[in-house]
A protein has these predicted regions:
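Two-component/phosphorelay signaling modules centered on CheY-like receiver
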Residues: 10-31
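Helix N-cap/capping motif at the beta->alpha junctions
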Residues: 32-41, 62-65
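Active-site beta3 strand of CheY-like receiver
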Residues: 46-52
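Receiver (REC) domain active-site loop signature in two-component systems and cognate sites
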Residues: 57
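Short amphipathic alpha-helix used as the core "switch/output" element in two-component signaling
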Residues: 63-74
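A Lys-centered signature of the CheY-like receiver
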Residues: 104
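CheY-like receiver
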Residues: 120-138
Length: 138
């Protein structure tokens, strides 16, 4: 089961995201944080597989949070959530290695597609690691 951290400053959206994650059999919510700073603090002591990360938050926006995650070399995948469908934001997120973008408002089906995309990429990476290990043995 994949562990998910939800980082969202709007309590209602955080609750909806938690419900959407819980509806997917392969995921569990490990924690919710209301801003990037508290998310970084949580990640210091806890491992998660995926972060659902809002772009617009107080104190530290989602992009700065993601830059700090990458700088600290925390091995985690990220799905960004934003209310704005701006090309520059999308490019910046892709440059920082996000798995997918969710543009508010989104449906459960769209949310599930993003989670399934994460699973596909995570499983492909595991397969690649297994192949590399077998190659090293021979």
């Amino acid at each position: 089961m994949y562990k998910v951290l939800i980082v969202e400053d709007d309590p209602m959206v955080a609750m909806i995201n938690e419900q959407f994650v819980s509806r997917h059999k392969d995921f569990t919510v490990s924690n919710k944080c209301s801003d990037g700073k508290s998310a970084l603090e949580y990640l210091e002591d806890n491992d998660v597989d995926l972060i659902i990360l809002d772009v617009y938050m107080p104190y530290m926006d989602g992009f700065e949070t993601l830059r700090q995650i990458r700088k600290k070399q925390i091995p985690v995948d990220v799905i960004m959530v934003t209310a704005a469908n701006e090309r520059e934001q999308l490019k910046e997120g892709l440059h920082l290695g996000v798995v997918d973008y969710l543009i508010k408002p989104f449906t459960f089906e769209r949310f599930k597609m993003a989670l399934d995309k994460f699973i596909t990429q995570a499983e492909a990476l595991k397969d690649l690691e297994r192949v590399n290990q077998k190659t090293l043995i021979f």
